[in-house]
Amino acid sequence: MESLLNRLYDALGLDAPEDEPLLIIDDGIQVYFNESDHTLEMCCPFMPLPDDTLTLQHFLRLNYASAVTIGADADNTALVALYRLPQTSTEEEALTGFELFISNVKQLKEHYA
């Protein structure tokens, strides 16, 4: 069975990446992919990690309102948006999930970055 990432690339009309799976979308949105046997994870840094705890708490509260999760990168320097799809997702579900993810990232960048 073909991987969900390859099926997503097919749905987008793109060739599968040969090296690091990364898509650069307009306005500097960089989507990194991490695929396991069970999930396809999409990750996009969208702004520097806030210095004050109130702003950080605001972003963490957004996790209750959306399927897109907000977290920090491994170096604690940037906020990242995360979205996971099960490997059992159809091509249509993967495309819909990707579009939802990109829409959420654009909104986050417009309002906060």
From Swiss-Prot:
Q: Where does this protein chiefly localize? A: cytoplasm
User: Where does this one sit in the cell?
Assistant: Cytoplasm
Annotated Gene3D superfamilies: 3.30.1460.10
Q: Where does it sit, as one GO cellular component term?
A: cytoplasm
Inducing stimuli: Transcriptionally regulated by InvF and SicA. Also regulated by SirA.
Database matches in CDD domains:
T3SC_IA_SigE-like (cd17022)
* Any matching Pfam family: Chaperone_III
Q: Which UniProt keywords apply?
A: Chaperone, Cytoplasm, Virulence
- Give the signal peptide, or none: none
Into which family does the record put it? Belongs to the IpgE/SigE chaperone family.
What does this gene product do?
Molecular chaperone required for SopB/SigD stabilization and secretion.
Description of how the protein assembles with itself and partners = Homodimer or higher-order oligomers.
Question: What is this protein called in UniProt?
Answer: Chaperone protein SigE
